Amino acid sequence: MEQPRKAVVVTGFGPFGEHTVNASWIAVQELEKLGLGDSVDLHVYEIPVEYQTVQRLIPALWEKHSPQLVVHVGVSGMATTVTLEKCGHNKGYKGLDNCRFCPGSQCCVEDGPESIDSIIDMDAVCKRVTTLGLDVSVTISQDAGRYLCDFTYYTSLYQGRGRSAFVHVPPLGKPYNADQLGRALRAIIEEMLGVLEQAEGDISCCRQL
């Protein structure tokens, strides 16, 4: 019997500040060219750097696609590696977006938990990707930055009950090019799907015992 195709949503961000070309969206476009194989329906979206758009768009993407996994990709001017973020944070959003706006409450979800962890074991994903011998270094972080990246991640984790991931990439050429970032994203997402399936298989086995 043929396995049903999995829906995977991957987002990058549009321009903001000094990032007139956002490496995250370039990397996602490279991923789209490569694809994730015949068993995955890949849906990519560019997200404006706007709090209110994120609050509207992220729930809509979850509702539209019912995805197995949503992966958000953002650029960090401080990053020199491709970084897997473990969690999103609810409070502390003071930076103005492209519309010169920030939430009056400075939080994502009123009365939401302080932080939400991804259900994906990022340490396991990092170890698996590292063994593949890519020409890209992959590391782990627990602080996505309290700006639109963190805001988007928390919103998605809240909406998807933890079935989200966030990947920070460096600016283009510092040190990786678009092709390297696209291939790294593909490897990371494939490993995330593997870790997710393994975890769900373990849960299923426990229920049958």
From Swiss-Prot:
Catalytic activity: Release of an N-terminal pyroglutamyl group from a polypeptide, the second amino acid generally not being Pro
GO cellular component, one term: cytosol
Single GO molecular function: pyroglutamyl-peptidase activity
Active site location: 85, 149, 168
Keyword Protease tagged: yes
EC number from the UniProt entry: 3.4.19.3
Main location, first listed in the record: cytoplasm
Superkingdom of the source species: Eukaryota
GO biological process, one term: protein catabolic process
Pfam families (alphabetical): Peptidase_C15 (PF01470)
Record flagged with keyword Electron transport: no
Subunit structure: Monomer.
Task performed by this protein: Removes 5-oxoproline from various penultimate amino acid residues except L-proline.
Family: Belongs to the peptidase C15 family.
Protein name (record): Pyroglutamyl-peptidase 1
Species for this entry: Mus musculus
Upper lineage: Eukaryota, Metazoa, Chordata, Craniata, Vertebrata
